[in-house]
Structures are given as C-alpha cells and as structure tokens.
C-alpha cells in the first residue's frame, strides 16, 4: 500500500461536510511539521483554514485545496459507508476521494519526496487549505488571500488540486475559469382572479418577452480560450399554487458564465436595459461569484505539462470549461494558477471514487512540478 493511499484514506475517514474540517487540517499540519513547514491555523466564523509555508523567500509555489466535501446524499444508495474508505476493483471509494482529498494527500507525499532530495530548494513551498470551498466560499480562500496580502506575502504559482482530468490522469488541466454572475429578479404585478384579468396585472405575462429576449442574446462569440458567454434561467416561481389566481409577483433566478470578452458591469447594464425597455416594475439583486481569469502559457503551465508528459506519457489539454474554483480568489493577486487533479467523472455522486494507480502517479506529477519550479 502506498503512502498516498494511506493518507487519502485517513482524510476520507474524517466527516468533513462543509463547513466542517473534522481534524483534516491538523493532520496535514502535523504531517508536514517535521519538514519545516510553519503552520497558521486561521478560523473565520465557522470555517477552518490552514496556511503552511516552508521558506521565507520567493518565488512561492502554493498548493490550494479544500478539506470540506459535499453531503453524501442517501447513504443507503452507496455501496459502502462513504466515510469508511473502501478499495474495490482498483478504485478507492469514499466521499472526497476525487474531490479532493486524494489531491491533498498526493501533494503532501510529493513534498516529502521532493524535500528528501532537495532540502535546500530555492523559494518557498506553501499549502492553502480551507473547509469552505463547497459552500458559500466567503470565509475560506478569499479570507486567507486577504490575510496574506495584509502580511505582504505573495503567491507566485498556485497549483489547485481540483479534479481536472476526464479520461486519463493529466489529460486536462484548467488554466482559467469563466466568471460567474447570478441574479434574482422580482417582477411586481397585481394579484387577481383569472376570470377578471382586466382587474389584475399578470407579472408572468409581462416578464416573459423580456426573459425571452435575454435568453436569445448572443453576448459574444468567446475567444481562443473561452466559449461564448452563457445566460441560463435556473428557477422561476410565481403564484399561490391555486389555478384560479393571477400571481402578484414573479421571481426569476438566473446565472451568466462569462468570458474575458465581458465585464460584470457591462452585463448588468445590458440586463437592466432590456428589463427597462419592457416597462417592468421590478427589483434585481446581483451576486458576483468570481471574475474570469486566464493563466497564459508560462512557467507553471509549462512545468505542469512537462511533469504530466514525464509521468503519464501524454500531452495535456488546456481548458477553461466547467464551473468556478477557489483559483478565482488567487488569480487577481497576479499569481499564475492552474488546476490539476484526478478524474472528475464521479465527483459529488453516489459512490465517488478515484483510481488507486492514479494516486501515486499524481504525487509524482506534483513532485515533478516542484522540481521544475524550485530546482531547475
């Protein structure tokens, strides 16, 4: 059994459903303390965060990850207890196996291997670990980044351990992410009887043309790194539940995933212009989850690509597809950011799992990145 597998199982046994850490960060800190990592345990409200650093000089290579996991769903539908890791058919099963306790284990073991051969490496190695990535993400990485900035500490390269691979380990790495902007629209009308529509004002009827116009907009054509901006309505609610009552208010929830071709300010302005043009009586609240970011090909992308080629014998694909990650909080500091981790096919699902053979391979890839950035 490998050290990476052992540590991954130890982490999975801890029931760290967001925002709980369940002792994972303490385990990581204790494991790395003998190697010279200085630990800062940072608690913001109900969220545990950990900043570990070895070295005081730049450049700084930081691994960013999260110990929290999503809820299991119906436990009876799992083939085994989601918090009792099981090995079956060459796979490690358990909540967090792919997202992303195996990545954390792989980087810890990579640090041990790297420092055994290169105790006098240049720069610094760091880990930024939070228990608030799967939840609101307001007291996790973003707060640690603010804390680092206040201390004058700067990350040069951020290696985010999110499960980026699709068919084979390392076949895809994320070198950017789209921005995410959500809106909650409330359109006011006047409630009334469906038989007397002239005595009421149906907000559904009023809003539908505007919503159709928003859904039909071609916001942009994307670019070589990003797909076109997407507008999606996720929820619509109106009425009392009775079939003979015209509703007095309509609530619509929507989201835009936008590329570097757009700004959140520009999107907001255009949405308001459409709603105003249709004469709606409305209020609209916004929530920006993150701006789009892109790490162009440079030291980090090159180091990751070369390490994958060395260990896996394949050329990786750069991608910005998918949802957001905590990389969105680190990129604005000027750091180069890539996401590299195991296969993502089972994340958040019943019977989440990861290939056992990929665990040590991922650790060797991480070791290769450390060597290329802090030795060569």
UniProtKB/Swiss-Prot annotation:
The Enzyme Commission number assigned here is 3.5.1.18
Q: Which InterPro entries match?
A: ArgE/DapE_CS (IPR001261), Bact_exopeptidase_dim_dom (IPR036264), DapE_proteobac (IPR005941), Peptidase_M20 (IPR002933), Peptidase_M20_dimer (IPR011650), Peptidase_M20A (IPR050072)
What cofactor does this protein call for? Zn(2+); Co(2+)
Q: Which GO terms describe its molecular function?
A: acetylornithine deacetylase activity; cobalt ion binding; succinyl-diaminopimelate desuccinylase activity; zinc ion binding
Coiled-coil residue spans: none
Family from the record: Belongs to the peptidase M20A family. DapE subfamily.
Active-site feature positions = 68, 133 (proton acceptor)
Name of the protein in its database record: Succinyl-diaminopimelate desuccinylase
Catalysis: reaction(s): N-succinyl-(2S,6S)-2,6-diaminopimelate + H2O = (2S,6S)-2,6-diaminopimelate + succinate
Checking NCBIfam families in the record gives: dapE_proteo, PRK13009.1
Which range is the signal sequence, renumbered to this chain?
A: none
SUPFAM superfamilies in the record? Bacterial exopeptidase dimerisation domain, Zn-dependent exopeptidases
């Amino acid at each position: 059994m490998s050290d990476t597998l052992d540590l991954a199982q130890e982490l999975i046994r801890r029931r760290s459903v967001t925002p709980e850490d369940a002792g994972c960060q303490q385990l990581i800190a204790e494991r790395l303390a003998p190697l010279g990592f200085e630990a800062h345990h940072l608690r913001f409200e109900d969220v545990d965060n950990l900043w570990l650093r070895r070295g005081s000089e730049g450049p700084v290579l930081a691994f960013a990850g999260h110990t929290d996991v999503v809820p299991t769903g119906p436990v009876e539908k799992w083939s085994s207890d989601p918090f009792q890791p099981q090995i079956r058919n060459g796979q490690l099963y358990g909540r967090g196996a792919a997202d992303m306790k195996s990545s954390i284990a792989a980087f810890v073991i990579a640090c041990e291997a790297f420092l055994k051969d290169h105790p006098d490496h240049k720069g610094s190695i760091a880990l930024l670990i939070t228990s608030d990535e799967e939840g609101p993400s307001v007291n996790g990485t973003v707060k640690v980044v603010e804390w680092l900035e206040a201390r004058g500490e700067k990350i040069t390269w951020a290696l985010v351990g999110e499960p980026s691979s699709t068919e084979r380990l390392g076949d895809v790495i994320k070198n950017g992410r789209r921005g995410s902007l959500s809106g909650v629209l409330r359109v006011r009308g006047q409630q009334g009887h469906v038989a007397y529509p002239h005595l009421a004002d149906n907000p559904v009827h009023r809003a539908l043309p505007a919503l159709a116009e928003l859904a039909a907009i071609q916001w942009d054509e994307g670019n070589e790194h990003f797909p076109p901006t997407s507008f999606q309505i996720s929820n619509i609610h109106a009425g009392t539940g009775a079939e003979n009552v015209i509703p007095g208010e309509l609530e619509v929830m929507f989201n835009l995933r936008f590329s570097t071709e757009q700004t959140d300010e520009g999107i907001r302005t255009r949405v308001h212009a459409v709603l105003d043009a249709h004469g709606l009586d409305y209020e609209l609240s916004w929530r920006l989850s993150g701006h789009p970011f892109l790490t162009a090909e440079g030291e980090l992308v090159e180091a990751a690509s070369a390490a994958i080629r060395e260990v896996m014998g394949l050329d990786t694909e750069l991608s910005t597809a998918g949802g957001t990650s905590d990389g969105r909080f680190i990129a604005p500091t000027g750091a180069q950011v890539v996401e590299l981790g195991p296969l993502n096919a089972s994340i958040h699902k019943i019977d989440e799992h990861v290939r056992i053979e990929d665990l040590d391979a991922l650790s060797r890839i991480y070791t290769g990145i450390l060597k290329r950035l802090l030795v060569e």
